[in-house]
Amino acid sequence: VNIGVNYGMLGNSYPTGPETERHFGLNPDTLHVVRHAQGFHNLA
């Protein structure tokens, strides 16, 4: 199960993990905050 981060403006979902962290320059804690701020919890 991968928890994705949904960016409404882009309409894309990215799995959390090292690749996402490198791409966005975010750490897991930041992604956690982003998920709650966006209000999206996607399961893939």
UniProtKB/Swiss-Prot annotation:
GO terms, molecular function: beta-galactosidase activity
TM region positions: none
Enzyme Commission number(s) of this protein: 3.2.1.23
Recorded catalytic activity of this chain's protein: Hydrolysis of terminal non-reducing beta-D-galactose residues in beta-D-galactosides
Enzyme category, top tier: hydrolase
The entry's keywords: Glycosidase, Hydrolase, Stress response
Induction field: By water stress.
Misc remark: On the 2D-gel the determined pI of this protein (spot N76) is: 5.8, its MW is: 32 kDa.
Stated family: Belongs to the glycosyl hydrolase 35 family.
Protein name: Putative beta-galactosidase
